[in-house]
């Protein structure tokens, strides 16, 4: 895979690997195989969080397993590593107070067995903490060398703008990447009503990211396997025409449907007013090999327009 140089200077693969279930529902042996396959295929952008996967374990497993992997393989310097802070951990409360940010970065560094995080996300917004306190605390991590770049996840557009305006006015580090739920089936923002507003990218957010030259890392981009198994779609999802088009294109091109969905996202920046999108997903080694075929697929202008207008 050819690498992309992001506006913040990070050089990443065009798709990111999610480590959400590593160490919990995905065993150490399986996770190592996935990581080896992803890196062998040219990937270098690995995403985790300090609370993965609390719904299946304690929430420490993913970072801990990744730290062991980097130790065993000796390849930490070969990857761009992203993790997050903000949700409740071990009853210490959700939030982005400076004490929480400072505590959890050290915990993440320890578990990941690294001296720095390439991309550190605010995993969720904290409306109860002054935005100045949040951005100054993150900036201190950058100045100390613990973090290279900052990102925001699950932020409303106006709050992302407020955070970066505050940082800019004070000479602090700004958010340079947004991570948000986004998929071809959810591309208009109104077709996944089971999710709350701030979890889905809408037109306003896409335009803001384009105007600010901020890439979008799209989580849940393969809808938990729904492109291959439509029973995984929410009952009230109204994206049937798009699903049918994806399957038609997949059959014509000899690809699996998820590869077409990935191609849509990696080609999306070619449309007027659309930001660069980096799909983020978890997969088995076999699924990785199939899905990543979409990265090298260049959609024609006509195909992009057809997909957009369906």
Predicted segment positions?
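Acidic (Asp/Glu)-rich catalytic clusters
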Residues: 7-8, 39-40, 67-80, 109-113, ...
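N-terminal binding-site loop/beta-alpha segment at the start of enzyme catalytic domains
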Residues: 1-77, 143, 221
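Conserved beta-strand positions
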Residues: 17, 48, 83, 119-122, ...
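Beta/alpha (TIM)-barrel catalytic core signal, keyed to glycine-rich beta->alpha loops juxtaposed to Asp/Glu
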Residues: 129-310
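Active-site groove signature of glycoside hydrolases
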Residues: 109-130
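Short, acidic/polar
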Residues: 26-38, 96-112, 161-165
């Amino acid at each position: 895979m050819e690498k992309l140089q992001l506006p913040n200077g990070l050089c990443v693969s065009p798709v990111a690997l999610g480590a959400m279930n590593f160490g919990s529902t995905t065993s150490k042996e399986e996770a190592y195989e996935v990581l080896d396959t992803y890196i062998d295929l040219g990937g270098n952008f690995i995403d985790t969080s300090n609370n993965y996967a609390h719904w299946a374990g304690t929430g420490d497993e993913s970072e801990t397993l990744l730290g062991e992997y980097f130790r065993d393989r000796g390849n930490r310097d070969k990857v761009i590593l992203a993790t997050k802070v903000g949700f409740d951990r071990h009853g210490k409360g959700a939030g982005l107070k400076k004490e929480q940010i400072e505590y959890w970065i050290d915990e993440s560094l320890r578990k990941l067995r690294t001296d720095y995080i390439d991309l550190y996300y605010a995993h969720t917004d904290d409306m109860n903490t002054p935005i100045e306190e949040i951005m100054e605390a993150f900036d201190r991590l950058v100045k100390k060398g613990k973090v290279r770049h900052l990102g925001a996840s699950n932020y409303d557009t106006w709050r992302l703008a407020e955070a970066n305006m505050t940082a800019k006015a004070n000479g602090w580090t700004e958010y340079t990447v947004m991570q948000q739920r986004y998929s071809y089936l959810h591309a208009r923002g109104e077709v996944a009503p089971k999710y709350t507003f701030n979890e889905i990218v809408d037109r306003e957010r896409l335009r803001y990211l384009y105007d600010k030259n901020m890439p979008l890392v799209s989580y849940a981009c393969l809808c938990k396997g729904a492109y291959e198994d439509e029973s995984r779609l929410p009952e009230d999802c109204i994206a049937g025409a798009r699903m049918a088009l994806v399957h038609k294109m997949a059959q014509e091109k000899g690809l699996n449907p998820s590869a077409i969905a990935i191609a849509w996202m990696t080609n999306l920046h070619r449309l007027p007013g659309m930001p660069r999108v980096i799909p983020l997903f978890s997969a088995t080694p076999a699924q990785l090999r199939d899905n990543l075929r979409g990265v090298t697929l260049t959609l024609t202008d006509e195909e992009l327009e057809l997909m957009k207008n369906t």
